[in-house]
């Protein structure tokens, strides 16, 4: 029997590797002993014959090696297609149960060895490589399949393969299939795809190694087995179904077994690769690459490049214009608000018209115009105010209303629009604050992010702060919130206060525009604003703020109540009043533009040299009798204020200066120190002429005379407030004839004597005006924000730097556009486009130059000449200059200014380009020639960048025989690197040009005030 068995084995061996391959595949398909053993065991431990191995079978069934060998011989004589299995289920079960016992006793594989995709990790690996199951190369799957109910299988096919494999491969490892070189190559191709998966499978394999033997022991009963009996039904049936599908397909199509096996081996490579593809397909689509340098479009010549350059230059030459979104209230459902709170008291209803007229005459000559004007009140209790407001008034010790308050309070409380004109220090602020509090308390509370109900606009920051301080005593009692917004401090803090909600906003016009334009109008909303006050309205329009004021009014509800107050109201204001007010009531107390009678006015005609000594004399007389008094000195210009400050400090007077050139923090601290008496003397420009209320202020000196009446009235009105007395001294030089008209008129209206010399100066100036030699000045010459931009820019730059250092956001800027800036933008854009030449190949340039030379044109060096501003005439001049230089020097191979681009030096490249920088600003030239920027470009592109030519002033052409204009030569081996370098240099040139244009438009504050 042994001889017969040996012959059968030899016949199988002679069949070649293909037979072995088919046999091994059948072993895996029918459940070999190695497939049934533990993953930690080898297949057979020793090379034994079938007879020696049979007694070790633990079950009671009969094991006949002869029958198995006979069936194996019949199978090898007539081989079948892979998967064509026939037999009986009973015999298959017997053999499959017998094999595990043999293998389990000979387990020699280390337990701690990491298991690959063919081991315990196969369960998770099958999810990624489903085609592995079709090849039946996994031991665990077959062990699962033996527990399922199987169809009828051929006993011949099932039993012959294990013994052929056992006899041939005594040292085969049960965990790894002993295949051919083709299988090893296929496994190697798939190895790198499973490398990352094996790391994750190691932990899973160890857990499975501990769980599966215990589960298998429940099936065998006597000794532990490997296959899991508790596997889910789907996990057991699916490998079987997949295997059967493969078998059926191969059986039907009659595919060669080796081809089918090799095809299945290559399939797993698509399994793992499919997952990354799926991930990429579900990922976010990346932006499409854009070609910056293509063959179809030369650098600097495209229309798109031109548009971009213009846009960039436009941003530098003109700052972005603030646009306030306009609200169409006709399409909104506006909730009506109550504005009329006036109920005429019984005491007033009994008064006749004659008695009312007499009362108004007694109250400083109140003049009113309008229909149905309420009668003036004489007590706080008759004004219709709430009890909390009256309690605060009592705490502030306001005994009775002033003249303007007596008439303005009942008119405003009735919901009418009002124009109030009263002398300085007459209590105009309380005249519009008290009705505003009553107006706000009648409405629903303001929620977060809702706009204010009351809006107060002022022309200066100091006046805004003054009004805000007057509001504070009422805010806590009434439960209201107020925000003071003005330029200088960071806008971020003011926006945060507004978002928390505020019923009252006191703001300057420019900062209010900034807030309304911020974040496309979503920061501040004026939809709930129904009460607007313009304090010192004439000065606001005088400074040119009419467009800004009209923008603000366009965003407020049409049913608003508007109040205008000022100490002066020129006739030119009448037309502007009609634009913003509806049927207003005009109230005039003491006349328009009149200095209070409590103020003593002194006008002195003297030369410039004697002013300072006279000032020292006035200060000495003032502080001789009383130390706790204040004096205010007005000058015309900022530098004059600083100069006078130094002179007074040298004389021992503690003083401070106040003007628009100072930071807002300094301005606030100066006013605070002046009011508290730290510095009893303050030198200021007209910025302090309005809204400044200091009780101890006894002396006002106009060191430089004001040039119009309204300014004089407000300057003098800083003293003699609230019934107190004061003195206003004005110095007028003989050259200031234009100031004589306003000062003389103010003296006449207030009943003060007018000096004869001043009358003569006024007469002389009027004659000059009639003769056309002079122009009368009456105020309203301001240019608005456009004029103030340049004057404030230096201070804003300092503030911006301070905010950046403190982590603050940049302060919002007023954006305006001028025609001059537009012209600069167009010129700079065209210059940048024309300065960059196209990228030219060295060979092409030489060929073109030789062709021109053959035609009798220019020399070969002319082709290498940089373009001079993109003009042919300049190009010819540069070419002729280069030719003359080369002819004179007669030396080759030396790099020098004007040398042709197609040189043979070490830096010569196959491609080159030029960029002329001679006519650009100094900042732009420095940006493209400084060592740091050039080194970065050289490192990034690997090109050669050389600065050539000489600098010539704008408008001057190089003389004959001289070097060409300053330009940059870029050389490189490829067109791409030259284009990249040229693009980077052009970007730097644009940035430098933008910085220069922006610096030019931001001139210092008219040379008035600088910090050194």
UniProtKB/Swiss-Prot annotation:
Gene3D superfamilies: P-loop containing nucleotide triphosphate hydrolases. Residues 854-868 have a biased composition (Low complexity). A motif (DEAD box) lies at residues 535-538. InterPro entries: DEAD/DEAH_box_helicase_dom, Helicase_ATP-bd, Helicase_C-like, P-loop_NTPase, PRP5/DDX46/KHDC4_KH, RNA-helicase_DEAD-box_CS, RNA_helicase_DEAD_Q_motif. It is found in: Nucleus. Residues 409-587 form the Helicase ATP-binding domain. Signal peptide: none annotated. Residues 614-762 form the Helicase C-terminal domain. It holds the Pfam family DEAD. This is Pre-mRNA-processing ATP-dependent RNA helicase PRP5. The lineage of its organism: Eukaryota, Fungi, Dikarya, Ascomycota, Pezizomycotina.
């Amino acid at each position: 029997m042994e001889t017969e068995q040996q012959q059968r084995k030899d016949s199988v061996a002679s069949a070649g590797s293909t037979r072995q391959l088919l046999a091994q595949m059948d072993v895996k398909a029918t459940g070999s002993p190695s497939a049934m053993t533990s993953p930690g065991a080898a297949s057979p431990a020793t090379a034994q014959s079938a007879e020696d191995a049979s007694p070790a079978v633990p079950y009671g069934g009969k094991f006949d090696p002869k029958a198995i060998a006979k069936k194996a011989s019949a199978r090898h004589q007539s081989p079948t297609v892979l998967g064509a299995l026939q037999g009986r289920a009973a015999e298959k079960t017997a053999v499959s149960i017998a094999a595990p016992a043999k293998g389990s006793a000979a387990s020699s594989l280390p337990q701690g060895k990491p298991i690959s995709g063919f081991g315990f990790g196969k369960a998770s690996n099958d999810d990624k490589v489903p085609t592995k199951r079709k090849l039946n190369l996994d031991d665990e799957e077959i062990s699962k399949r033996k527990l399922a109910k199987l169809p009828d299988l051929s006993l011949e096919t099932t039993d012959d393969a294990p013994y052929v494999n056992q006899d041939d491969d005594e040292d085969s490892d049960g965990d790894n299939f002993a295949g051919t070189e083709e299988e090893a190559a296929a496994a190697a191709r798939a190895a790198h795809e499973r490398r990352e998966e094996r790391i994750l499978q190691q932990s899973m394999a160890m857990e499975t190694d501990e769980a599966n033997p215990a589960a298998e022991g429940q099936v065998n009963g006597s000794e532990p087995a490997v296959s899991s009996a508790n596997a889910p039904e789907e996990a057991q049936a699916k490998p079987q179904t997949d295997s059967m599908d493969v078998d059926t397909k191969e059986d039907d199509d009659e595919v060669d077994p080796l081809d089918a096996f090799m095809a299945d081996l290559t399939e797993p490579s698509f399994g793992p690769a499919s997952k990354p593809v799926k991930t990429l397909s579900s990922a976010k689509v990346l932006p499409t690459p854009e070609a910056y340098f293509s063959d179809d479009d030369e650098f600097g010549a495209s229309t798109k490049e031109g548009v971009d350059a213009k846009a960039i230059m436009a941003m530098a030459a003109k700052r972005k214009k603030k646009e306030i979104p306009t609200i169409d209230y006709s399409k909104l459902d506006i909730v009506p608000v109550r504005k009329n709170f006036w109920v005429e008291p019984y005491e007033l209803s009994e008064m006749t018209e004659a008695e009312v007229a007499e009362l108004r005459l007694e109250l400083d000559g109140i003049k009113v115009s309008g229909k149905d004007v309420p009668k003036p009140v004489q007590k706080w209790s008759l004004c219709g105010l709430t009890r909390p407001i009256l309690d605060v008034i009592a705490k502030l010790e306001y005994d009775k209303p002033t003249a303007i308050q007596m008439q303005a309070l009942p008119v405003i409380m009735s919901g009418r629009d009002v124009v109030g004109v009263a002398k300085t220090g007459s209590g105009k602020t309380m005249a519009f604050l008290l009705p505003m509090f009553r107006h706000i308390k009648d409405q629903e509370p303001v929620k977060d992010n809702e706009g204010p109900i009351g809006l107060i606009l002022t022309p200066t920051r100091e006046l805004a702060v003054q009004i805000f301080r007057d509001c504070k005593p009422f805010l806590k009692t009434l439960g209201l919130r107020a925000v003071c917004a003005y330029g200088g401090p960071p806008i971020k803090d003011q926006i945060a206060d507004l978002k928390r909600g505020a019923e009252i906003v006191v703001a300057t016009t420019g900062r209010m525009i900034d807030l309304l334009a911020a974040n496309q109008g979503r920061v501040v909303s004026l939809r709930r604003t129904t009460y607007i006050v313009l304090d010192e309205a004439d000065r606001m329009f005088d400074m040119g703020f009419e467009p800004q004021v009209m923008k603000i009014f366009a965003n407020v509800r049409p049913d608003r109540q508007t109040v205008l107050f000022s100490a002066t109201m020129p006739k030119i204001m009448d037309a502007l009043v009609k634009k913003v007010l509806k049927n207003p009531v005009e109230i005039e107390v003491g006349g328009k533009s009149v200095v209070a009678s409590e103020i003593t006015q002194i006008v002195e005609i003297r030369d410039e040299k004697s002013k300072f000594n006279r000032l020292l004399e006035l200060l000495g007389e003032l502080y001789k009798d009383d130390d706790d008094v204040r004096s205010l000195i007005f000058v015309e210009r900022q530098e004059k204020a600083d100069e006078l400050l130094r002179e007074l400090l040298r004389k021992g007077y503690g003083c401070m200066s106040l003007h628009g050139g100072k930071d807002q923090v300094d301005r606030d601290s100066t006013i605070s120190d002046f009011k508290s008496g730290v510095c009893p003397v303050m030198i200021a420009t007209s910025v302090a002429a309005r809204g400044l209320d200091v009780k101890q202020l006894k002396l006002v000196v106009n060191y430089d005379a004001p040039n119009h009446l309204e300014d004089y009235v407000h300057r003098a009105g800083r003293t003699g407030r609230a019934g107190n007395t004061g003195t206003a001294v004005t110095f007028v030089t003989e050259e200031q004839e234009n100031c004589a008209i306003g000062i003389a008129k103010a003296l006449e209206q207030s009943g003060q004597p007018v000096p004869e010399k001043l009358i003569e100066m006024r007469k002389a100036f009027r004659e000059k005006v009639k003769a056309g030699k002079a122009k009368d000045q009456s105020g309203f010459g301001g240019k608005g924000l456009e004029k103030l931009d340049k004057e404030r820019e230096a201070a804003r730059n300092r503030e911006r730097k301070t905010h950046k250092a403190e982590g603050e956001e940049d302060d919002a800027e007023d954006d305006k556009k001028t025609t001059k800036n537009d012209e600069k933008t167009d010129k700079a854009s065209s210059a940048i486009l024309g300065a960059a030449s196209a990228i030219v190949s060295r060979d092409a340039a030489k060929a073109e130059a030789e062709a021109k030379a053959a035609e009798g044109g220019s020399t070969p060096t002319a082709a290498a000449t940089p373009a001079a501003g993109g003009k042919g005439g300049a190009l010819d001049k540069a070419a002729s200059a280069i030719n003359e230089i080369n002819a004179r020097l007669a030396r080759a191979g030396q790099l020098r200014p004007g040398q042709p681009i197609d040189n043979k030096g070490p830096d010569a490249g196959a491609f080159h380009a030029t960029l002329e920088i001679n006519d650009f600003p100094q900042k732009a030239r420095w940006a493209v020639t400084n060592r740091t920027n050039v080194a970065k470009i050289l490192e990034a592109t690997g090109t050669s960048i050389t600065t050539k030519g000489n600098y010539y002033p704008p408008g001057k052409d190089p003389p004959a025989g001289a070097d060409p204009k300053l330009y940059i030569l870029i050389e490189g081996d490829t067109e791409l690197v030259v284009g990249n370098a040229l693009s980077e240099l052009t970007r730097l040139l644009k940035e430098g040009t933008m910085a220069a244009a922006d610096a030019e438009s931001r001139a210092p504050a008219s040379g008035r005030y600088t910090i050194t």
